[in-house]
Amino acid sequence: DETPIQVLKEEGRRPQSKSYVWLVRTGDNGGIPIILYNYTPTRAGSHAAAFLAGADPGYYLMVDGYKGYNKVPEAQRCCCWAHIRRYWLRAIPKGHEKDYTHPAVQGFLYCNKLFEYERSYREKGLSLKQIYHRRLKDQKPVIEAFLSWLDQLHPESGDRLIKAINYSNGCRPFMMNYLKDGACSLSNNLSENSIRPLVVGRKNWLFCDTPAGADASMKIYSMIETAKANELDPLKYLSFLLEHRPGAEMSDEELEQFAPWSKLAQ
């Protein structure tokens, strides 16, 4: 996910220029929670590609409909069904929430059915392998029906309805990628929740003075939010780091001892 920030002293840019923070985090599949923030001066998709450089080829990338993510190579892009559902929800006219003949309501219900299945899997405590097989049985037919239904829509009016159709069509190439692995999420909600502390903080600190300050701030955010995600007290974790002072001269194995999920940090 990405969100704008203001950095006052960027070379060759006005103080009012819009800069960006990118967030990348691990999914909710039971692995180690890692949350990383990265400052860049623009929203160009090449920044996302650089941020993710070095990841194993073929990894799954859960994002919204921003086309800049198409520049990320070697990733299997997955679309966020929460974003798609939100477009259909916004397209429902006031007072028509129960009008099941209205296309916006129908589109919303198609999307919502996927989330109902996901909720049932969690309630039943299914394994990732079981989720993979159940998704193919339950959810793939829903998506296929949704796409066939979408092909039949040709509205002549209704800006929000047209936006919902266009947004959904833009996500077509990625709609079923999450079905390939039970560890994939259905939505990008986890990233949106993780970027919220930065958004709330931005309302208080307003801007960063320099690019170096913005970069340092995002490193601090990364440490604090990853510590919180690993159920650590962030103040105690930062004190732990300052006491031990891990440095660049250490090997990767030595540095990992100071990660929030390490036994030493826990």
Where are the model-predicted features located?
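Catalytic center-proximal scaffold of phosphoryl-transfer enzymes
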Residues: 2-266
